[in-house]
């Protein structure tokens, strides 16, 4: 059964150019499973529940695939980390440019109410198979490696993780902000 996970595609000309630059399409031909983490970004009630303030209905479709990836990573000895979008006093104070200029006052208030720690919107989506050994890390900006959050980089380094599989609610927002930062941090 084929499942359409998202509507993104890469033009064949871009794939060819990248392949020529790298000497092949794949960045890694093999993964060391014990040094690999599955980073699950923003699969939370505030993004996924029907009628939620920041609902992205399409994200519900990827849950079975995310669960399969998480289980495969665990079975191979890797780590699963759930990243939670967090709006709290620190986020509002340290990312005022976003909250004051990119959000209307009404939208800002909705986000403040939807994503504080412990709120319904902050909770991991119940369809995800979260195990006690999995980690949960809060983020206060689009990227999981951005400032003013627990240092995901240090958490991963302490566990000798150097390879990430990133899945999440919005490929073109928080996943895309997380991936290049991870690469830049090696």
Language model features by range: what are they?
Residues 170-174:
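Gly/Ser/Thr-rich loops at beta-strand to alpha-helix junctions
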Residues 84-86, 140, 169:
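Short, well-ordered beta-to-alpha junction loops that form the rim of enzyme active sites
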Residues 117-167:
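Internal catalytic-core helix/loop-beta-alpha segment
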Residues 1-135:
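Active-site acidic carboxylates
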């Amino acid at each position: 059964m084929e499942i359409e996970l998202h509507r993104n595609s890469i033009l064949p000309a871009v794939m060819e150019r990248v392949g020529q630059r790298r000497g092949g399409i794949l960045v890694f031909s093999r993964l060391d499973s014990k040094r690999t983490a599955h980073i699950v970004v923003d699969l939370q009630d505030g993004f996924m529940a029907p009628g939620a303030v920041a609902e992205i209905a399409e994200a519900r479709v990827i849950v079975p695939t995310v669960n399969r990836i998480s289980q495969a990573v665990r079975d191979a000895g890797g780590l699963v980390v759930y990243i939670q979008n967090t709006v709290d006093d620190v986020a509002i104070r340290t990312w005022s440019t976003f909250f004051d200029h990119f959000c209307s006052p009404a939208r800002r208030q909705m986000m403040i109410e939807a994503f504080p720690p412990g709120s319904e919107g902050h909770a991991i989506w119940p369809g995800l198979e979260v195990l006690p050994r999995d980690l949960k890390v809060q983020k206060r900006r689009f990227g999981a490696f951005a400032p003013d959050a627990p240092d995901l980089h240090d958490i991963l380094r302490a566990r000798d993780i150097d390879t990430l599989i990133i899945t999440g609610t919005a490929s073109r927002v928080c996943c895309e902000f997380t991936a290049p930062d991870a690469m830049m941090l090696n």
